[in-house]
C-alpha cells in the first residue's frame, strides 16, 4: 500500500476526485489517498495556496512510521505512482531534482515541527530545518508545469484558477484558449466524473 497525502483547500475541492482518479487509473499497487486541508488539521489558512505547510504534517499523520508521498492538489498523474515511490530512501525527504518539494517521497521517521507548531513557521524556515534530510533526485518528468510534454509523468497546473474556471465556464472550458495540457486535464475531468460535473445531471 502506497500512502499519498495531498495538500488541498476547499476552493479546489472539485479537483480532488480528478487527481485521485488519475492516481488510481495508473497505479499498479493499492493506494491510500488522504486530502489534507488547513481546517481538517486545525491550521491557519495561510500562504498563497492555503496549504503550503501541510506537507510537513505528513510524518506525524503517519505516526512517524513507514513512508509516504506528498503532492499538491493542482496535479494530474500520467504514470504509475509506484515509480515515484521507488525514489524513496531511508532517512531522506526525497524531493525534485531542482530542490522544490511540491512532489516528495518522505521517510516518515523524519520529524518536522509538530502540527501544533506549524502555523508558527514559514515554509522556507521549516525547509531549512530539514535541509540535512532533503535529497533532490526526483526528475523533472514528475513535475511538468503548465504545459504538456510527451515524457511527462505528472502535470502541475500552478495556476489553480484553471481548475476553478473549469466548473464556472463548463466543459470544455478551455475552448477559447486550448493547450494540450488543458485538454489532458479536461479528459481526466470527464473520465473522473463519469462525463458529468459534480452538480450536473445527464440530459
PLM region spans:
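A glycosyltransferase accessory/donor-loop signature
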Residues: 2-11, 18, 29, 33-35, ...
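Alpha-helix N-cap/loop-to-helix initiation residues
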Residues: 12-13, 77
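Short, highly selective alpha-helical patches that border small-molecule cofactor pockets
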Residues: 16-20, 103
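Short alpha-helical segments and helix-capping/turn motifs at coil-helix boundaries
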Residues: 21, 55-56, 140-141
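Active-site-proximal specificity loops/subdomain of glycosyltransferases
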Residues: 31-64
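GT-A fold catalytic core of metal-dependent nucleotide-sugar glycosyltransferases
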Residues: 54-98, 104-112
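Short gly/pro-enriched beta-turn/loop segments at secondary-structure junctions
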Residues: 98-101, 148-150
